[in-house]
Amino acid sequence: MLDLKQIRENPDYIQELLNRRSASNEYDLTPILDRDRQQRDIEATRTQLQARSNEIGKLIGQKMKSGINPQSEEIQALKTEGNDLKTQLSELEPQEKQLKSEIEALLLQLPNLPSESTPLGKSEADNVEVRRWGDEYLPKIEVLPHWEIAERLGILEVERAVKIAQSRFIALVGAGAALERALINFMLDCQINAGYLEVIPPVLINSDSLQGTGQLPKFAEESFKCSEDDLWLAPTAEVPVTNLYRDEIVEAEQLPIKHCAYTPCFRREAGSYGKDTRGLIRLHQFNKVELVKLVHPETSEAEHQSLVNNAEAILQALKLPYRVLELCTGDLGFGATKCYDLEVWLPSSGTYREISSCSNCGDFQARRANIRLKEKGKKGTQYVHTLNGSGLAVGRTMAAILENYQQSNGTVKVPDVLQPYLKREIL
């Protein structure tokens, strides 16, 4: 959530940053500023009325103490004025409460501000390529799409999964299930060795958690909700792991806090009709290892780069060709102030596809979730910065392996680093 004080003091600058996100200028600060002025006017009036009410209470006490008859005209007039003030105050209170509620609702609809260093752009076409890695590992043969080789190997069940659930669900069997499990364990082991503390969080989460990380209220239609409880299926482990610290104050000496977590993830994929209808790229349920950091604002940028490196390390260990993109303002995620996407090479389509999105959210999520830090010897608290990224999306990693490691005889070589997990060299 954005800082209302910052909006109030620098409305033109904040509006300009929001406009960088949207060519249609869909984010208008005017309704917030109007309500903020009304609320502050009411607050000022209420303060004056309360001061006068307190003054009258003291006057009545002083006069009665001095021996003036409580039924005297003077005291009765003061009591009448005091009652009138209480009536006015009682009428102002719900007005102010309503305005505060409306301001908060409007603030929750606003995305994070792009950093000054985020490239300007309108869409993904304007994202900036930072680097490529692994050209020497590009396949030398023509390969089949990952879903076709998986079905030929008998490791992927689509029709039976659809029978159980609906479209965009799959079942992995035999070596496919083993490869998925091996990838999860390998990814977790790598990140634990990099200093992340593993968490197994709930995957059913409440609305406060989704609001804290920015999925609610704006993106409710993209998540699955339980019909009888205030519980949602987690779209990413970023949500429950970040919310472990909701409404808490951490000591500065504890930072950075670094967690990795494997969870199944659930997304309705609203608006993706007709896209990636086959294979492992776009599913309603998929597995992912997530990286989450809570960091000091002063180290935020360096910690972000480190998180990107941690995600890249998985692709490098697997020897999968990829590229790193810095997202432009028009393609930036709702909660991010700066973001790098890792895209892995899928040779069957001749394209790079996103496999990790590494975001620096600044204090945006921390303000929504009320996660603060306290420094020794300093008064007050400040909001932490939160970072998150996939380390990695497991299904998409499997898709990349099935394509990049295909052999001319129709088998798939197991990457060297996964062979100790799978106890085999060939699928």
From Swiss-Prot:
ATP binds at residues 267-269, 354-357. Its main location: cytoplasm. It comes from the Bacteria. GO terms for cellular component: cytoplasm. Keywords: Aminoacyl-tRNA synthetase, ATP-binding, Cytoplasm, Ligase, Nucleotide-binding, Protein biosynthesis. One of its GO terms (biological process) is selenocysteine biosynthetic process. Pathway: Aminoacyl-tRNA biosynthesis; selenocysteinyl-tRNA(Sec) biosynthesis; L-seryl-tRNA(Sec) from L-serine and tRNA(Sec): step 1/1. L-serine binds at residues 236-238, 290, 390. GO terms for molecular function: ATP binding; serine-tRNA ligase activity. It catalyses: tRNA(Ser) + L-serine + ATP = L-seryl-tRNA(Ser) + AMP + diphosphate + H(+); tRNA(Sec) + L-serine + ATP = L-seryl-tRNA(Sec) + AMP + diphosphate + H(+). It holds the Pfam family Seryl_tRNA_N. It is found in: Cytoplasm. CDD domains: SerRS_core (cd00770). Its EC number is 6.1.1.11. InterPro entries: aa-tRNA-synt_IIb (IPR002314), aa-tRNA-synth_II (IPR006195), aa-tRNA-synth_II/BPL/LPL (IPR045864), Ser-tRNA-ligase_type_1 (IPR002317), Ser-tRNA-synth_1_N (IPR015866), SerRS_1_N_sf (IPR042103), SerRS_core (IPR033729), tRNA-bd_arm (IPR010978). HAMAP family: Ser_tRNA_synth_type1. Catalyzes the attachment of serine to tRNA(Ser). Is also able to aminoacylate tRNA(Sec) with serine, to form the misacylated tRNA L-seryl-tRNA(Sec), which will be further converted into selenocysteinyl-tRNA(Sec). Belongs to the class-II aminoacyl-tRNA synthetase family. Type-1 seryl-tRNA synthetase subfamily. Consists of two distinct domains, a catalytic core and a N-terminal extension that is involved in tRNA binding. Homodimer. The tRNA molecule binds across the dimer. This is Serine--tRNA ligase. It comes from Rippkaea orientalis (strain PCC 8801 / RF-1). The gene is serS.
